[in-house]
Regions:
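Short, glycine/polar-rich helix-capping loops at beta-to-alpha or helix-loop-helix junctions
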Residues: 12-18
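Catalytic metal- and UDP-sugar-binding loop of GT-A-like glycosyltransferases, i.e.
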Residues: 57
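Short internal beta-strands
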Residues: 6-10
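Conserved donor-nucleotide/metal-binding helix-loop-beta segment in metal-dependent transferases, i.e.
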Residues: 64-88
């Protein structure tokens, strides 16, 4: 299929990350140092050394499905950048075919301005951008209402 997946996490070598990578049959790589933007740029740049495009997702969006990934990959073949925005103003998935050096520098992370600022920067570059429907991510205890009801999570159930 020409697709590959890598689990990029910290701390590198953590037993849970190792187990997840083994179960999924994917490579485990260390996250670089720095803020979220520096880590994103490093991971994307590394992937783009050997691939034509890269999709990055976080681990906090339970509603992001395989179908979303396939849709994003299809759209990235026709656009310079793709997103599934988060309901809170960020994004749950970002896909790029190239990464300008310093693109994520001074991004207002963890604010409602992340997606609008990212779009502003991409429009300034003249890029074609595709965006899917907004999805919920889990950043706070209040966001736990977005967990699928069928997930067995007894500790979470005690919190909600």
């Amino acid at each position: 299929s020409g697709l590959s997946a890598t689990l990029c996490g910290a701390p590198h070598g953590h037993p849970l990350l190792v187990e997840l990578a083994e179960q999924a049959g994917v490579e485990l790589t260390a996250q670089s140092e720095g803020d979220l933007g520096q880590r994103l740029e490093a991971a994307m740049s590394q992937a783009l050394c050997t691939h034509d495009a890269v999709l990055v997702i976080g681990s906090d969006c339970p509603g992001l499905t395989v179908q979303h990934l396939h849709q994003a990959a299809r759209e990235l073949a026709r656009h310079d950048a793709v997103f599934f925005p988060a309901l809170d103003g960020g994004y749950t998935l970002i896909g790029l075919r190239r990464i300008p050096t310093g693109f994520f520098y001074d991004m207002p992370w963890s604010t409602r301005s992340v997606m609008p600022e990212t779009l502003r920067r991409l429009v300034a570059l003249g890029w074609q951008v595709w965006s899917g429907e907004p999805l919920a991510d889990i950043d706070t205890a209040d966001d736990l209402v977005h967990l699928p009801k069928h997930w067995p999570a007894p500790r979470v159930e005690q919190m909600t």
